[in-house]
């Protein structure tokens, strides 16, 4: 991934996630119990990965910013006929940590 693609990719993923997680639902789609936590985990790992990989933004701002975005989504979901869940935010934060870790690992492998 080229360094100049991290910000546009992150913006695109952020917008997509925000719309998807705030879109009003009549009822949750049928899915196995807890599968939404996996979706949160993967989504926020995907969001943090490109920023950690390129290293243009410090890791602490990536962690705080992406985790705060997940928390903000959970706080405003009730305004969109969605339910807030602290466990969703925990899955977001774990995803951020793993996304950062994968980005750092890939950066290290690419340097060899």
Model-derived regions: residue spans:
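Bulky hydrophobic segments
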Residues: 1-89, 93-112
